[in-house]
Regions:
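Sec/Tat signal peptide C-region and signal peptidase I cleavage site
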Residues: 14-18
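Sec-dependent N-terminal signal peptides
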Residues: 4-13
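N-terminal catalytic scaffold of extracellular/periplasmic and nuclease hydrolases
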Residues: 19-165, 169-189
Length: 190
């Protein structure tokens, strides 16, 4: 059974950015979740899900550039950057051109950004929002790219891609502007 991954991207406006309140964006992705899985969830819960309370819900076509059956890398890139790519590729279009993601665009506009994943933070779905790489399986390279991205907050697994690396670098030590914690109590103290 395929594990569903929930990824939440929070874009929080800077205080005083403008007189008008700029809306926040929260993108929740159920990795591997389609209409069939949503329907099954409804049937299992007396024809009701929390999705019904959302003001906005959207569907997108996230198939790969060259195949209708996609993987998390190609579909994540489609959601994050609005372009089709090959299965296994993150943040690079079908012509091998790196593309900006919505997370990067929001960072440029002064928003705070966050990535939260129930999987490794270097997994294809969250990585589609910050990585530009030809293989979703290059986890250590993906972790390095995250360490260079200035995401305000990230939560997820995959610590070994940051501190038990083949190149012997400890990215956690190098990321001195971040507090790294391993439980919710420590998170609230951070």
């Amino acid at each position: 059974m395929r594990q569903l991954t929930l990824l939440i991207i929070l874009f929080i406006t800077k205080i005083g950015l403008s007189q008008e309140k700029t809306p926040n964006i929260i993108l929740m992705i159920g990795d591997g979740m389609g209409l069939t899985q949503i329907s099954a969830g409804m049937y299992a819960n007396n024809n009701s899900t929390a999705l019904e309370g959302f003001e906005y819900i959207g569907l997108s076509k996230t198939y790969a550039y060259d195949q209708f059956i996609t993987d998390s890398a190609a579909s994540g890139t489609a959601m994050a950057s609005g372009v089709k790519t090959y299965n296994g590729v993150l943040g690079i279009d079908s012509k091998n051109i790196p593309k900006k993601s919505i997370l990067e665009i929001c960072q440029e506009k002064g928003y705070n950004t966050a990535l939260i994943a129930t999987s490794s933070i270097a997994h294809a779905t969250p990585a589609a929002f910050y990585a530009k790489i030809d293989s979703r399986r290059k986890y250590e390279d993906i972790a390095l790219q995250l360490s260079e991205h200035n995401v305000n907050l990230f939560i997820g697994g995959g610590e070994m891609f940051f501190n038990k690396r083949e190149d012997k670098r400890n990215l956690l030590d190098e990321m001195s502007d971040y507090d790294f914690v391993k439980n919710l109590d420590k998170l609230s103290e951070s």
